[in-house]
Amino acid sequence: MLNNTNVNNGDLVSRVSRQMRISRILIITFFIAYTLITLFPIYALFIRSFVGTKHATDLWLTPPPLEEASMDYQWGSLSVFYNLDSEKAKADLGIPADAYIQSRWTLARIAKEYDIPEQKIKDYFTPYSVYSGWIVLFTDNKFWPALFRTILITGLSLFGLNILSIMTGFGLAGLRRRDQMFVFNLYLLSAVVPLMMILLPQYMIVQWLLNLIPGYGVSGSTIRNVSQIAAIVVLNIKGGALGTMIYTGFISTIPKELGEAAEIDGASILQYFRHIVLPLLKVPIATLTVMVLPSLWNEFMGPYIYLDANNTTLLPLIQSYTGTYTTNYQVSYTGIFVSIIPLIIIYILFRNWFIQGAMSGAIKG
């Protein structure tokens, strides 16, 4: 009887162990599939950056092969479809800078007119069939300044938004007085006001204030460029309802006894804020950062309206590559892919910090 019981127990343990292994395999398979499905759009976007306008309606899972440039291509068509920098192309091919090339001239005629070997022209234009987006984007002298301005505006906006939200949350923490509740409700009210409702008056006020700055009217001046960037940062950090909610809720959970003990020890409010409150705010800082970083980085409307074309950020620059009659989709896809790389790098480097903030929800339990 004892042996039979041991056998039955062994079979039961074996079945449970087998079921657990199967469950573990299914769970791992599910998460692998989910990860692949999540990453596929990024992979598809990367592949599309190599697919020219000619094949824009086709589905490609790998980069297409290079297509040798035909000598029947017209100069004007290449300029439109490849966003070709005519002056740079003429310099690279050895064509005089003051030479006038008609848009209907074929590459064969250009080779004959300026005594250029046909193979040299083919070798020059063939990479454009696949790498047009990358060539145009990284040789455009507007791209790197636009990337720098995007990083600058995002960084300053994040810093300013966190600082102002922390100070507001510290002032409203506890909501013990009626005036504190009134101010807190005003912040919440600002979150439900549509941007389009205040866009025009906001634009008029900002332009009026900017025009008060000496030298702002000079196009391309440093004062004008810096003032426009400062205006974008101020608009990004004003009225942070989300940050106020997060920091007010978190700071309210800090025991009052800490403040009373600091006061007894002779600490001022500023010292209490700096040495006790601030070190406890790592989690809400991560929470607010992970929630607003994508929207700040991908902001289009503000820079498009308030920044000049030579002082813009990434997304308006990418939009400027869209033509009136045709669009080089390689440039658009390449620009979008490049614009998300910094975000991916940031989330990879600070993933533990962000996960901690997202899981805790900035509420101390």
Model-predicted segments: where are they?
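A hydrophobic, multi-pass inner-membrane permease signature
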Residues: L2-S70, S77, F81, A91, ...
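Short, solvent-exposed alpha-helical "recognition" segments
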Residues: I95-I101, V283
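Amphipathic, charged-and-aliphatic alpha-helical interface segments
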Residues: E87-A97
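Compact, charge-rich alpha-helical regulatory domains located at protein termini
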Residues: Y73-S77, Y100-W105
